[in-house]
Amino acid sequence: MERAVARGEFACLVFNSVSIKLKGRGIRSVIAAGVVASALSAGAVCAPAMAQDKASADHIKAVTSAVDTGFIRANAATSKDWPTIGLDYAETRYSKLDQINTDNVKQLGLKWTYDLESVRGVEATPLVVDGIMYVTASWSVVHAIDVRTGKRLWTYDPGVPRDGGYKGCCDVVNRGVALYKGKVFVGAFDGRLVAIDAVTGKKVWEEDTIVDHSHSYTITGAPRVVNGKVLIGNGGAEFGVRGYLTAYDADTGNQLWRWFVVPGDPSKSFEDESMEKAAKTWDPAGKYWINGGGGTPWDTMAYDPDLNLIYIGTGNGAPWNRNKRSPAGGDNLYLASIVALNADTGKYVWHYQETPGDNWDYTSTQPMILADLTIDGAPRKVILHAPKNGFFFVIDRTNGKFISAKNYVDVNWAKGYDANGRPIEVPEARGEKPYDAIPGPYGAHNWHPMSFNPKTGLVYLPAQHVPLNLSEDKSWRNNSNIPGQAMSGLGWNLATAINVVDPTSQPFGRLIAWDPVKQQQVWKQDYVSPWNGGTLTTAGNLVFQGSADGRFIAYNATTGEKLWESPTGTGIVAGPATYMVDGVQYVSVAVGWGGVFGLLERATDKEGPGTVFTFAVGGNASPPEFTKYQMQGLVEGVKYNPADVGPGTLLYVSNCVFCHGVPGVNKGGAIKNLGYIPASELANLKDIAFNGPFKAHGMPDFTGKLKEEDLLKITAFIQGTADAIRPKPAAK
């Protein structure tokens, strides 16, 4: 079921000098005496006033219809608008606007906030063209907002089934939309690509992008549009899928081309020469094709119009453990790689693999940037990339040749890269003993956007570490559901055991200013937690970033000095945008804690709905009220059989842990920690787990997946863990 609420569907009447506006969400103005409700259906429109209204249907149609490849390229010269997810096709997130700068940023104030009406993660960067904003919330819901007023124009809900949230590894998030020739494009969480009329919010067309519905494919990334082609990838490697990128006709939705990242069953014909080449780097004894092999290109893309190349970053292996999917080893192309494709045909041109034979969920899907740098005295067209594996790469984007790589955080899986661009691996990283992975699968840098300022020559990189210990799961089989295997009850296929031994490394969150030519850190800012927001840098010598503990911050781009901050209540994970409207520069950021780390942890004691915060110099609007996060004391008093704690632990790991965390240990993020729920709820867990009473919030229905005796064992684990960690009364 889908829902569109459109500003364009209203009547504007003048009666006894009183204007009445009826919007899809109800009557916003007071209906004056003498105005009869039946008149609202008359269809009379205040045409002269509407012609002057920059939020009118005519104006929105005019400005959004002008957005095409030429518009996006031309806008890169001024940065007046923010027409594509990374601002420009190079994904620099560098704005040439400087009305807000180091001299006046302290005068930045709130202009307005907009309630996204979401309680899960918000990862989208807003698009803005001449004061019309398009942004997504959780569940792939699209909002159109009038920047001049902060008011809603329309919303579009693609109707993603709310009980299907478990089909994604990392929350029901969406990183934004694409805008092209009067249409807004969104990749829905359930795998549909939807084109929406930019004026009305009505669906124009939709296409199912999923090739195999027996596995859990999802979409969380933003589409890109290049020369009339809408490009979209997918996620789901944890669930055993085969990654691919597809191009659709922006006008009709017809599929134009598709490129698979990894090969299929070698007993069948390969789609093209690139797949035949890739198959030679996989061991068929692992029967990798049963669960796809992975490689899903779920986020980053960039486009070089001069070379006519699309660049994508590819994902991790399925399963994680290479010993299982490819027992004889091999690079397993094109996992964890940057791949260049012909933008017209989708044909493979070149690749550079950043993590050969990925074994640690070291995706290369993290945002990349195209830049022109002088290296060793010569101009080079390069890709700048900081993937999960902890190394910062500089790659020649004309041919995929390796230029340099340097670790931007501590790493223990490799000592560095040789002259040929191959990692010098540490043998223990693939050993049989439990291994404290640094970085871990959360990545030294995840999807949070980085930015590049050509004036300072620096990249502003959200770095982090979330400790995890990895070891081989020798009991794993394809699509097995064995208690104790991480989330196997919901379809995960890792072949890797997590935290069988407690990790000893320490977590951190950090903003790093990195010199890509010298391959060194210039300055840094440390945070209280991992999982901080993406960055934006400007010609005003500023860097903007949101933090996990609920602050939106501006730094001096050259020195790293903190110049300004504003509280946002809940944590920020998304990247901000800046743009000019009627001669005024604005900065907007979509706030809403969540994502894979944010599901089970938090860094602030406040919470609230997803909200767009918009700032300008001199703004003085009041922020929304921040609600204190309600976390009761550790649950106590629920009776259980101590013998059930062990089996309950295994069942919890297989069905609950990646959403709810460890009872009483994690704080609970976008989803509650079960160690802190009321005893009455824990004692009646079957009323929560069966028949889907909370599916509207993303909770799956475990009917048929678990039995009542299983829930009693899970209850025993939760209560037993709470009892074990509860502080003991001080001895008298």
What are these regions (language model features)?
Residues 187, 703-732:
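C-terminal capping alpha-helices of c-type cytochrome domains
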Residues 648, 652-663, 699, 704, ...:
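The canonical Cys-X-X-Cys-His
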Residues 661-694:
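Gly/Gly-Pro-rich "capping" loops immediately C-terminal to redox-active cysteine motifs
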Residues 628-651, 667, 731:
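Electrostatic cytochrome c docking/interface patches
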Residues 82-86, 119-141, 166-192, 218-239, ...:
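Repeat-blade elements of multi-bladed beta-propeller folds
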Residues 114-125, 155-178, 206-222, 260-300, ...:
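Extracytoplasmic beta-rich repeat domains
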Residues 53-110, 268-276, 422-423, 500-501, ...:
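Blade/loop signatures of beta-propeller domains
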Residues 87, 397, 659-666, 690-691, ...:
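Detector for the c-type heme attachment site
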